[in-house]
């Protein structure tokens, strides 16, 4: 009975209001839970609060990760990875991504950028048993944290196996959780903070260049800082700062006076070393620590030594209008500052560039300054500017240019100025690059110049791309600006105010120039050392700042010794890379007006050899709108500029092979050099000088090409070709004599068609390249020439059916002249020789099989028709 009553009580109907209330509560709970997991997972963060607290309230909160056994660190074997940095960016145009790349480029470190995948394919990380990357950088560390399980495991295994570290940045925004745990790590983040007074942890193991003795007083830029907190032994603070306000950070288990803004993960948690930044690179100390992080995580493979060589040039000595020149007190200050700087830079010496014509052309007080400067002549280094400060590219006659230099040299001799420094600078860097041949010759003739410098190679901006090169026996060094120009002579009138100049020096552009370049030549001017003496102020403050914040060892050398040191560090820069002077307005302004870019060819026939390039050269020359180069006395119709030593003769030498353009716009020059095709240097060089050029290559069966080259060498009495049969040549092993292997390479390597065309494709768009069927050029030249004319876009199309005739005696097509006669190629073309033996053909068919398959894929990708011989070869491989 009682059981029955209880049952009836439980079975009473529930009131509708209570049901609705329960449903509403469940909905709220569901929304909260969904937001908790979805939002936290998407951000790669897990909310931090009391629920994350350890059962022991006296102990700072820890993650379950802390309870896992510590994994032993695998020693870094840097020999197993290539010195390449993989940079994952948010987009190709993101500011932080560009700043990361800029530092790597300035340091001349090789890198590869990839859009960071949330899901999808990870770039190939290994090549056989080698790692392709020595360091991974994430612009947004959450893209790493939120990788799908497959790619995350792939990347982490790679980092552990090859000892590769990770650098990551966390940039908070308005949607960031104020306090959260980084998913999967015993690390807590507190975001959107304003910070001040940044200091460096002197115990941080990654510090190399950074000197940890000082505190950067004042507010850090922005209110979106993130600080890191953990009690796991794997995390070591690198930079620390205070909060702007005295309030404690919510959810922070310990009220610390200093908070970690850059943290180093020693790899004790999962075997991977990392460095994490709580903001971007806007703060100058982050740039400095980033450089150290790259060095540390790569075992100093990607690192510059601590030595920095500095040379300060003062151009325009004696030049300048009244009121801008140096007076007696300014000259004394120059000398005193030099002595002061020598306490930090052994033998530091200002390098003075003079134009003697303007001596004693100031006020009386300024003329006295000139006299005092000359009385100190032995205290400084000296170099010649131009006598009258004229730009050398305006002198088209070398003898006139030499006369100007001779006047300056006489002035130097008369006043005891040294004339054997071997260094000179041209006003406005005119004539140095683009090269004015007359300047280089006159410099050597009058002064014996061995070194100069310019800010124009390869371009003025961005400055991090400036390089050196060697031309005509003169070493050219990159020159840097320092924020001072001829018009910046008063501190309070500095553009943007004095704070802008101080910002450039203290952690800004000038500081970074020295930080990221082992050798820096700075351009200043006479006017920077009069009035407020901004030149002295700038370099005293710079040296003080460098000594305070870095372990860099500042040194100096005279210009010639400095040049040798530069090319000892960067030997790969000796070879210049000539560029189109008309593509850069500054270059065009300092290039002789007697020269024109219209004299450059618009078409190159690049080969390869023995495919019909000479025939195409002849056929193109028949067109009234097309003009070929003048023949070379050494290499016949070929200039062979881009692939060998002729390149070092410069673009003036190259242009001499082409006519001076007429006033018509229809001038279309072309050249043919068949060994450009397989040259490793030619594609990059051509693209630099002729970025809009059209490229034509002719392909025949590579086996036939190899055999033709062998027969060509026999006809020219090559002793190796005479001694060995074709089969012996192509089958020669690695132990064969060197000259035999050289002939083998010239027979076989040009036939790697896909390899060579891909190299050209790295520098030219597919629509700039035309691949011709050499077999059709031989049998149906008129039809092929119609294709060529369409490719070139010539307005006056020529009907080659009417201008070409087959010569049965020669066995190929020739130019048809008036009266029915023909003009054919010389007797060296179209030679008859025995057919290739079947064993050799079979060997070469197998040898080139994979190359031909790759060629077919490449031509399909380029949208080009497959040559008839290639279709036949592919059919035979099935």
From Swiss-Prot:
This is Bifunctional heparan sulfate N-deacetylase/N-sulfotransferase 1. Monomer. Residues 595-878 are annotated as: Heparan sulfate N-sulfotransferase 1. Its main location: Golgi. Glycans are attached at residues 231, 347, 397, 663. Pfam families: HSNSD-CE, HSNSD_N, Sulfotransfer_1. The lineage of its organism: Eukaryota, Metazoa, Chordata, Craniata, Vertebrata. Keywords: Disulfide bond, Glycoprotein, Golgi apparatus, Hydrolase, Membrane, Multifunctional enzyme, Signal-anchor, Transferase, Transmembrane, Transmembrane helix. The active site is at residue 610. Residues 39-878 are lumenal. The chain crosses the membrane at residues 18-38. InterPro entries: Heparan_SO4_deacetylase_dom, HSNSD_N, NST/OST, P-loop_NTPase, Sulfotransferase_dom.
